[in-house]
Amino acid sequence: MAFTYIIKADTYIRETTVNANVDTTLILPAIKRVQRNIILPILGTALYNDLISEIVSDPDLSSNVPYQTLVNNYLTPTMVEFVNAELPPDMTFKFTNKNIVKKNSENSTSIDLQELRNIIQRATYRGQLEGEKVIKYLIANCNTLFPLYRTPGTTIDTVFPRQTMFSTGMNLGYERRIGFGYQIDPPYWKF
């Protein structure tokens, strides 16, 4: 079975500053990764599978206005930003049978690794902001328009919808910075 894309490469090119001469075979794997790794956890298994089946039967979703609104107003901006984060390494580096090489051009200058990281971080943050809008929209409309959002499934491979796009680190211990090392303090409740 062929993979069904929520957005097309042409949509991505139209929505961004990516040059129109970029080969779509470079863009499609990034869209696929974003769809599987970002959009599926946002929507949950049931809603994602239902959306994909609707796209297969009606590619422009004209018969399903709630899904059309979800895709056009919420998922497309989210996917565009996350593809912006996924695409630069794919376009900068090429895997060959002997090595990983950095692509270059005769009349342009490549960016350095720190600039590449900055571009990826900015696009990821913008994608998280857009993803947060998707989640809030789905939560606000889960009782009326998207009941599958609340019931993602019961099988072992079910992906439950995310409740937020942002995550923070976890403090795993009591440590205090001393000089160049760390000193582990005992927990305060032990005497």
Please place each PLM-identified region on the residue numbering.
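Conserved short "hinge" loops at termini or chain/domain junctions
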Residues: 1-76, 90-191
